[in-house]
């Protein structure tokens, strides 16, 4: 593990560096408070800090306060060194943000075990961060496909529409539905159906830009949100996705399972400004036509469909219900 040692006394610094290196630490040295703070800024892997109280430019107390007043992640565990052993000094050091306090001259064994305790704190904090990130990911993503879930993708669409209104840029929405998916489940089983859903999600994700949003609305329904994409381009993307989904079957347990998708497209440049729910309903109407026109194709929403959507939206909330 990397550790930062900040002390202005060359003899003390050399002695502490010798101990720390002998215990397996990768040591970075600083001679004053300002260089210590710069070292932490330059290398986020420095998670342990042994810092002297009395130093030029910025002392140990100022360093502690600067760290605690800055970003709290990644967490830096601070051991404050000083010749001051009065209880009020110890309280002042801990109150400034130090995690531990060691009075000079240091006992090497005591420093070693205190740093070991610091490492445990850092490891626990890292586990907490990973658990929090995992929970956040699970809350926003579909468990089967890894795509954004319904709530998350609608939230992204809402944000993109706000950005688009500021920039005057179009947004396209693609609503897709796998064709004859019930037949796939009935013929090959639900495990095979899940494999088809995962493969469809992979191809949809691979077929759009890195900053486009792809989500699973539920069942065999998918949605793509394409910022800065007009209706003509959105339709071309949808047609490409239809080809991608139908060209190659998915292999499952030695069986090749053919599949395809129908897609409806609606874009803000077709109808001027549009709400999230209006775009989705217009795209869904185009999807319905694509299904009835023979499936495995993409169709663009027409003005009549959008007018019908506008009439309906006047009697409904602005948001799409969760389910």
State the predicted function of each range.
Residues 181, 200, 214-217, 222, ...:
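Hydrophobic framework residues that shape the active-site pocket
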Residues 235, 268-300, 305-321:
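Catalytic-core segments of nucleotide cyclases and related cyclic-nucleotide turnover enzymes
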Residues 14-22:
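Charged docking surfaces used in two-component/phosphorelay signaling
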Residues 216, 245-262:
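Catalytic core regions of nucleotide second-messenger enzymes
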Residues 136-155, 176-190, 198:
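Conserved nucleotide-binding and Mg2+-coordinating catalytic segments in signaling enzymes
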Residues 154-188, 204, 215:
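Active-site-proximal structural segments of metal-dependent nucleotidyl cyclase/transferase enzymes
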Residues 93, 107-143, 151-162, 212-213, ...:
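Signal-transducing coiled-coil linker helices
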């Amino acid at each position: 593990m990397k550790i930062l040692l900040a002390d202005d006394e060359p003899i003390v610094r050399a002695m502490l560096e010798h101990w720390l290196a002998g215990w397996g630490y990768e040591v970075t040295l600083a001679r004053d408070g300002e260089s210590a703070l710069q070292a932490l800024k330059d290398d986020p892997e420095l998670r342990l800090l042994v810092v002297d109280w009395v130093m030029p430019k910025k002392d140990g107390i100022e360093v502690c306060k600067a760290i605690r007043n800055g970003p709290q992640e990644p967490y830096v565990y601070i051991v404050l060194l000083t010749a001051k052993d009065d209880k009020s000094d110890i309280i002042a050091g801990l109150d400034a943000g130090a995690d531990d306090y060691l009075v000079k001259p240091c006992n090497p064994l005591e420093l070693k075990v205190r740093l070991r305790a610091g490492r445990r704190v850092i490891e626990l904090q890292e586990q907490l961060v990973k658990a929090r990130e995992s929970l956040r990911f699970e809350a926003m993503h579909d468990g089967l496909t890894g795509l954004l879930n319904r709530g998350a993708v609608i939230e992204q669409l809402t944000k993109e529409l706000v950005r688009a209104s500021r920039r005057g840029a179009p947004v396209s929405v693609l609503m897709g539905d796998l064709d004859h998916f019930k037949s796939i489940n009935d013929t090959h089983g639900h495990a095979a159906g899940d494999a088809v859903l995962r493969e469809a999600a992979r191809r949809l994700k691979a077929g759009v830009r890195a900053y486009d949003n792809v989500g699973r609305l539920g069942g065999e329904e998918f949605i793509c949100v394409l910022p800065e994409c007009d209706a003509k381009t959105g339709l071309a993307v949808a047609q490409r996705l239809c080809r991608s989904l139908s060209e190659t079957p998915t292999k499952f347990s030695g069986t090749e399972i053919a599949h395809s998708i129908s897609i409806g497209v609606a874009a803000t440049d077709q109808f001027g400004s549009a709400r999230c729910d209006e775009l989705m309903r217009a795209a869904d109407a185009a999807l319905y036509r694509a299904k009835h026109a023979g499936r495995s194709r993409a169709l663009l929403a027409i003005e009549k469909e959008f007018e019908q959507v506008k009439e309906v939206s006047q009697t409904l909330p602005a948001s799409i219900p969760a389910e």
